[in-house]
Amino acid sequence: MIDLNSELMEQKMKVDFNTYDLSVKELLSMVNDGLINIAPEYQRQFRWDVERQSSLVESLFLGIPVPSLFMATNVDGTWEVIDGVQRLSTMICFAGDDNVREKVNAKKVEPLKLKGLSKLANFNDKRFADLPVGVQNKFKLTSIKVITLSDKSDKDVRFDLFERLNKGGVNLTPQEIRSCVYRGGFNDFLKELSKDSNFKNCVHLSESQENDGTREELVLRFFAYLYDLDSFEHSVKDFLNNYMSKADKGFNYSENDKLFRTVFKILNDVLPNGISKGRKNTPLNLFEAVSVGAALAYMDNGKINTVGIDEWLKDKELLKYITGATNSKPRVIGRIEFCRKKFEG
């Protein structure tokens, strides 16, 4: 019989939280000093309207409890916002100076002018600078509860927490969450390669995908399937998370940079319409098959045979591997191996 209590205790041991009561002034100071980071993935999605921002400010003035801010502690001791970016950004847009606002790319936005307040009607049409110093100080000294996930917590727990807390707020894609959780050299490497011109010509994405981390995820898929295919079971998300958490160790950046750029230079030369199969956007499973298959062939032979590629991309056997239950391990292996053999000639 499964010991439910043991399972509960095992999972709880992976999570370590600390709780703080911080004033608005302290939070703004921490943002200004770089101790609190709001990831670019969050910054681009700050979209509360003026009325909603004003309502939060009114609640803070009146001492009405607002939801806690959730942060994750990084290895260097800084905090990363997990949940509460809209609330923190509102405080910054209302009471932050130019230096603080610049930290969240809000310097070009006009300071918040309160609107639609019902309890504090005389505060409407006022900015922070328009308020008496005593009123400003009361706002700055308002306390906010902050809960931080310590850096001792398991990386998978951090990813899970980001995912859970963002389901009702800012909708980040799995790769945007990875970019927040697995910060470091490998994450920076993915972002750099995602800008490669040949790669961009080969892979066609929708407008929304161009801005949600999909390009970085495709670079991650390329290396994950190239080097860690044996670890893949069925969940692509878990597979990519696991690879990203360990890829930084012993990864040869210079060799893999050269490999990636070489493969996509060759593919771009022979696929003027990209990896598309006649579609506007590139199917992810076809991308995996063609790019990883080409890389394996190049690693084995120092070249990629592209003769007849237009014909064999229409082959019924390949079609079988990229339709239906495409994330089953046999089909992933099947489509990559099919392309590898074709590229080897």
What are these regions (language model features)?
Residues 232-273, 279, 286:
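Small-residue-rich helix-loop
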Residues 2-26, 39-238, 318-326:
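Basic- and aromatic-enriched surface patches that contact anionic nucleotides/nucleic acids
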Residues 1-9, 337, 343-345:
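Short, Lys/Arg-enriched, disordered terminal segments
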Residues 312-345:
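Eukaryote-biased recognition of C-terminal alpha-helical segments
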